[in-house]
């Protein structure tokens, strides 16, 4: 006498033998060597993605859908996978049906559960498995939520005393263990980050330099500071250290200013005497330095060029007269 196989078991058998499950359950022990293992894995992947039938966009959608489902919480992932979405848009539609609006009318962020959440996979157990449905994160033989089990799907509800959800994250992706700073309310997903943030409020500087005793809040700041001490591995070598100040042996007897070169001292002392030994041959104006009178004579040259179209020649037929010392 034949025993009829229930529809639920038949659907599970198809799912467990799907190309996606064969690809995910692959182990190196399934092949005699690494080269054979790579070839077998490549063949299993082709059986799942079927590049001869699907376009690149369709295969990419399968990979995106798998990663999207693996990022969901375990209970939500089990419920969405039991509906066998064929694309990311179908998975998003199921999540919107499950989680509903972001907040209920009374102001809380509780989410509603559709009527068929606890119906289990029997409602869709007769759906044919095409081998394209990646049940990401579900172990072989795992069943969906059992009928009548009220604990199968428990959507996350933020309690009034719980910290606020992480900004920028959807409600179903914010972990219930998210912590926030009691001082300013800043939310952190990692306790280590929160601990380091709270040190900024207390002013605590637990990391002290053994060389000079200066304290720092973060360890990397201390490491960077220790490199500035001479002899440390990160301190600059002799070639990178600033050179000592050079001696300036030539000093002015009037103001005490010192110079490296004697010529600079001689030129400086003329500023105290007020002497202007260089005169312009055009207007007779005197200057203390030769380069100043040369710069001044360019003004006369430009004026003459604009008035006559050429610069007035000097005594030898060349350019303007060079400056000569007065007296």
Curated annotation (Swiss-Prot):
Q: What PANTHER family has UniProt attached to this entry?
A: ZINC FINGER AND SCAN DOMAIN-CONTAINING (PTHR23226), ZINC FINGER PROTEIN 444 (PTHR23226:SF150)
Q: Where is this region: Disordered?
A: 101-171, 220-243, 305-327
**Keyword set, alphabetical order:** Acetylation, DNA-binding, Isopeptide bond, Metal-binding, Nucleus, Phosphoprotein, Repeat, Transcription, Transcription regulation, Ubl conjugation, Zinc, Zinc-finger
Query: Residue positions of the PTM N-acetylmethionine?
Result: 1
Annotated ranges, domain SCAN box = 20-104
ZnF C2H2-type span: 179-201, 207-229, 250-272, 278-300
Family assignment from sequence similarity = Belongs to the krueppel C2H2-type zinc-finger protein family.
Taxonomy of the source species: Eukaryota, Metazoa, Chordata, Craniata, Vertebrata
Say where the protein is mainly found. Answer: nucleus
Per UniProt, the ranges with Polar residues bias are: 106-118
Q: Where is the composition biased (Low complexity)?
A: 134-148, 305-314
* Gene3D superfamilies reported for this sequence: Classic Zinc Finger (3.30.160.60), DNA breaking-rejoining enzymes (1.10.4020.10)
Q: Where is this cross-link: Glycyl lysine isopeptide (Lys-Gly) (interchain with G-Cter in SUMO2)?
A: 8, 190
What is the originating organism of this protein?
A: Homo sapiens (Human)
For this entry, the protein name equals: Zinc finger protein 444
**rRNA processing among the record's keywords?**
no
The record's Pfam families line, in alphabetical order, gives: SCAN, zf-C2H2
* GN (gene name): ZNF444
Q: Per its UniProt record, what InterPro entries does this chain match?
A: SCAN_dom, SCAN_sf, Znf_C2H2_sf, Znf_C2H2_type
Q: What highest taxon heads this organism's lineage?
A: Eukaryota
Modified positions (Phosphoserine) are 18, 104, 235
């Amino acid at each position: 006498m034949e025993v009829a196989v229930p529809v639920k078991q038949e659907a599970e058998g198809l799912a467990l033998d799907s190309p996606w499950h064969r690809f995910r359950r692959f182990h190196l022990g399934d092949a005699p060597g690494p080269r054979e293992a790579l070839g077998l894995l490549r063949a299993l992947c082709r059986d799942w993605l079927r590049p001869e039938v699907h376009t690149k966009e369709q295969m990419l959608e399968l990979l995106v859908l798998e990663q999207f489902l693996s990022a969901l919480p375990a209970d939500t992932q089990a419920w969405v996978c039991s509906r066998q979405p064929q694309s990311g848009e179908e998975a998003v539609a199921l999540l919107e049906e499950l989680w509903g609006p972001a907040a209920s009318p009374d102001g809380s962020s509780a989410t509603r559960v559709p009527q068929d959440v606890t119906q289990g996979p029997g409602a869709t157990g007769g759906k044919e498995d095409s081998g394209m449905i990646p049940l990401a994160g579900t172990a072989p033989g795992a069943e969906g939520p059992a009928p009548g089990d009220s604990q199968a799907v428990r959507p996350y509800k933020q309690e009034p005393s719980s910290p606020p959800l992480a900004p920028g994250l959807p409600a179903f992706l914010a972990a219930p263990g998210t912590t926030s700073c009691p001082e300013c309310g800043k939310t952190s997903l990692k306790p280590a980050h929160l601990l380091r943030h709270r040190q900024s409020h207390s002013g605590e500087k637990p990391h002290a330099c053994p060389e000079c005793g200066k304290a720092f809040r973060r360890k990397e700041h201390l490491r960077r500071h220790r490199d500035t001490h001479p002899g440390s591995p990160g301190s600059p070598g002799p070639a990178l250290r600033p050179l000592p100040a050079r001696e300036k042996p030539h000093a002015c007897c009037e103001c005490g200013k010192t110079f490296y070169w004697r010529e600079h001292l001689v030129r400086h002392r003329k500023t105290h005497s007020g002497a202007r030994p260089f005169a312009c041959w055009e207007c007779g104006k005197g200057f203390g330095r030769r380069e100043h009178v040369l710069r001044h004579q360019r003004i006369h040259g430009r004026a003459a060029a604009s008035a006559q179209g050429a610069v007035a020649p000097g005594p030898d037929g060349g350019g303007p007269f060079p400056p000569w010392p007065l007296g």
